[in-house]
Design a protein with these regions (language model features):
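Acidic/glycine-enriched connector segments
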Residues: 1-90
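Defense-system signaling and execution modules centered on TIR/cGAS-STING-like, death/scaffold domains
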Residues: 42, 72-109, 114-116, 129, ...
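Catalytic NTP-binding/metal-coordinating core of nucleotidyl cyclase/transferase enzymes
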Residues: 97-179
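A generic structural signal for short hydrophobic patches within well-formed alpha-helices
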Residues: 116, 169, 204, 243-244
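Catalytic core of nucleotidyl cyclases, primarily class III adenylyl/guanylyl cyclases
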Residues: 142-168, 183-220
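Short, charged, amphipathic alpha-helix that recurs within catalytic cores of restriction-modification
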Residues: 221-231, 244
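Cytosolic regulatory/linker segments at or just downstream of nucleotide-handling modules
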Residues: 234-282
């Protein structure tokens, strides 16, 4: 029993039992990213042991696709497939057997202003005008770079953004962090107010919000991202292991991820690995 003998087990998405193409892709990308992060941590090359019959497979997330990604990452791949009939397992589900794939992988940003509840009424009015206007300017800059959020929402001291990929989300999160740290004029905030920013990535359900009329996203991965934010240190950006893995798999070398350990998340969401996001060189 390989699973029973494993030293550790990662569950990429414990919130859903849906078997679709996105689930296979998500798990495969996290596998690749975690392998790359571990190789970087150990300052060694990435070597992969694979069991593959040499067949093309059925697309993204399959064995052939994973091997192609490993080779693209510069990994050494050793195939230990014995080629004997007794070692061939039952055929896995094909994409034709899977449920419809309507949950794209998206990156989720939650941010909260610490100290907001202690502001006076006139300070809240200034915060709403200056701070949120400044955030809107950051969104405009992201749009010019082709990295604008797919959805955005705010409620007083909270921000929620959804991005297409980890690169766009990481760049925006660090720009927001820097603007608050440096007390940029357009992001004027009282000194007692600090920002916490959290990032996570996973399959989500897109929908058109019938109340606002704008695109939005829902699902347990959205809730998971929200539970990271309360444990983030002030004026820092923290990310889930899934986000760090997907960023590593995508080859985002301009960022670094400092492992903070396994942390209890807010509202009894369990213990999960958390990383601090920084620019490389910080």
């Amino acid at each position: 029993d390989a699973l029973g003998r494993a030293k550790s087990v990662r569950i990429a998405n414990s919130h859903s039992s849906t078997a679709d193409g996105t689930a296979f892709e998500y798990g495969a990308r996290i596998l690749l990213g975690l392998a790359r992060l571990e190789a970087q941590r150990l300052e060694t090359e990435l070597r992969a042991l694979v069991l593959w019959d040499g067949r093309a497979g059925d697309g993204v997330g399959g064995t052939a696709w994973v091997i192609g990604q490993l080779l693209a990452l510069g990994a050494t791949v050793e195939n230990v497939y014995p080629g004997r009939e007794g070692f061939i397992a039952a055929a896995p589900p094909t994409h034709d057997d899977l449920e419809d794939d309507d949950r794209p992988i998206r990156t989720l940003l939650f941010s909260d202003c610490m100290g907001y509840s202690k502001l006076r009424e006139e300070q809240i009015a200034e915060y709403t005008r200056a701070f949120l206007t400044g955030v809107a300017r950051l969104i405009e800059l992201a749009e010019k770079e082709g990295r604008a959020p797919l959805a955005a929402n705010t409620w007083g001291d909270g921000l929620f953004f959804v991005f297409a990929d980890p690169a766009a989300a990481a760049a925006f999160a660090l720009s927001l962090r820097d603007a608050v740290r440096h007390r940029a004029l357009e992001l004027a905030m009282p000194p007692e107010v600090r920002l916490r920013i959290a990032l996570h990535a996973g399959p989500v359900t897109p929908f058109q919000d019938p109340i606002t009329g704008r695109p939005n996203f829902a699902g347990m991965n959205v809730a998971f991202a929200a539970r990271i934010e309360p444990i983030v240190p002030e004026n820092q950006v923290c990310v889930s292991e899934a986000f760090a893995a997907l960023a590593a798999e995508a080859g985002l070398t301009e960022f670094r991820f400092d492992y903070l350990g396994v942390t209890h998340l807010h509202k009894e969401f369990g213990r999960h690995p958390v990383y601090q996001l920084r620019r490389r060189g910080e």
